UniProtKB/Swiss-Prot annotation:
One of its GO terms (molecular function) is ATP binding. Its EC number is 2.7.7.18. CDD domains: NMNAT (cd02165). This is Probable nicotinate-nucleotide adenylyltransferase. Keywords: ATP-binding, NAD, Nucleotide-binding, Nucleotidyltransferase, Pyridine nucleotide biosynthesis, Transferase.
Length: 200
């Protein structure tokens, strides 16, 4: 049975840390494919605070185009209204009923996942994979993981991987200050940022 994972995010911008996580997940879980899904209108973020969804889509598209096992979906970008994770997973489950489906997210999601819309449905349709995030101790992550597993009666896969010290927020702040960010993002992402004068 094919194994595919959804890797959703705002990707504002996509950076080397995202790609590092994707490669580690690909190898650790022996995945056939990772599907990057740039969020359209995430319910937890104000629309005016994020870059145009089509620009973010292109940043991801060109960042991953050389990797055969990475692909991009425009499902959320084209979707009208808010982008809820459970709807995205239902969409992929509908068109790929006979695959092992995984959903990759930062371990910080464990803190408020009980507030996610239709989380029960999501947990039934995809296996949750979490990776560590800066600012969260291993003890905290494992405690929250156990709490969520007990609540939803589902196992959660934890990827204990060394993280690159980079975040989209940090990159945006560096650009505002005029600092160099070339080593933190894919070259084609950098070119798009320069083209549109983003984050200044």
């Amino acid at each position: 049975m094919k194994k595919k994972a959804i890797f959703g995010g705002t990707f504002d911008p996509i950076h080397n840390g995202h790609l590092h996580i994707a490669y580690k997940a690909l190898n650790r879980l022996k995945l056939d494919k990772i599907i990057f899904i740039p969020s359209g209108n995430p319910p937890h973020k104000h629309k005016e605070c994020i870059t145009d969804k089509n620009i973010r889509y292109n940043m991801v598209k060109y960042a991953i185009e050389q990797e055969d096992k990475f692909e991009i979906s425009d499902y959320e970008v084209k979707k009208k209204g808010k982008s809820y994770t459970y709807e995205t997973i239902e969409h992929f489950r509908k068109y790929h009923p006979n695959i092992d489906l995984y959903f990759i997210a930062g371990a910080d999601c464990l803190m408020d996942i009980h507030k996610w819309k239709n989380i029960d449905s999501m947990m039934e349709k995809a296996k949750l994979v979490v990776f560590s995030r800066p600012g969260f101790s291993m003890d905290t992550i494992l405690f929250q993981k156990k709490q969520v597993e007990e609540k939803f009666k589902k196992d959660i896969i934890f990827l204990d991987i060394p993280l690159l010290d980079v975040s989209s927020t940090e990159i945006r702040e560096k650009i505002k200050k005029g600092e160099d960010i070339k080593d933190l993002i894919p070259e084609k992402t950098y070119n798009i940022i320069k083209k549109y004068g983003l984050y200044r």
